[in-house]
C-alpha cells in the first residue's frame, strides 16, 4: 500500500533509525540487521544520522552499547549539514526532503509527526520483534 503513495520506496530499503529504536532493539535482544530483513522480507540498510549519534553520545554511559553498535560498518552513516538540531527534527526534515526512507522509532511524539508526512512507513519494536505500522486510513482513501 505504501508503494502506491511513495514510488521511491523499494528494496534495498533504507531505514532511518532513531535512538530509542536502537535502544529498544538492544533491550529486546534483537539483531537489527537480521530482524529488519525478516520483517521486510528484503534487504534493508539501517541508516544513522550524525544527530542520532550525537544524541547517543550525550546520553552517556547507559547508552554506550547502542553507541558502539552504531559504529558497525553495516550501518550507513548520514552526515548532517546543520548544527545543534534535535535528532527528531533532523529525521523529520530528512524524510520530508527525501521520500526514500522508512523510519524505525518507538517515540510516540516522533511517530505522530511522521504520520503527517504521506507515504512514510514506520517500523517499531513490539512483542520482541519489528512491526511495520499500517498505512493511515486518510492516505488509503487518496
Locations of regions flagged by a protein language model:
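Domain-level signal for Mg2+-assisted phosphodiester chemistry and nucleotide/NA-binding surfaces
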Residues: 1-75
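Nuclease catalytic cores that cleave nucleic-acid phosphodiester bonds
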Residues: 47-142
Amino acid at each position: 500500500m505504501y508503494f502506491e503513495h511513495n514510488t521511491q520506496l523499494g528494496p534495498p530499503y533504507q531505514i532511518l533509525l532513531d535512538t530509542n529504536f536502537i535502544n529498544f532493539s538492544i533491550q529486546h535482544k534483537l539483531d537489527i540487521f537480521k530482524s529488519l530483513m525478516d520483517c521486510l522480507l528484503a534487504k534493508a540498510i539501517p541508516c544513522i544520522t550524525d544527530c542520532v549519534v550525537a544524541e547517543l553520545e550525550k546520553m552517556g554511559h547507559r547508552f554506550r552499547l547502542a553507541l558502539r553498535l552504531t559504529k558497525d560498518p553495516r550501518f550507513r552513516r548520514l552526515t548532517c549539514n546543520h548544527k545543534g538540531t534535535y535528532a527528531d527534527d533532523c529525521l523529520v526534515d530528512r524524510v520530508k526532503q527525501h521520500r526514500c526512507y522508512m523510519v524505525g522509532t518507538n517515540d510516540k511524539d516522533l511517530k505522530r509527526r511522521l504520520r503527517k508526512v504521506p507515504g512514510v512507513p514506520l517500523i517499531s519494536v513490539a512483542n520482541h520483534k519489528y512491526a511495520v505500522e499500517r498505512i493511515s486510513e486518510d492516505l488509503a482513501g487518496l
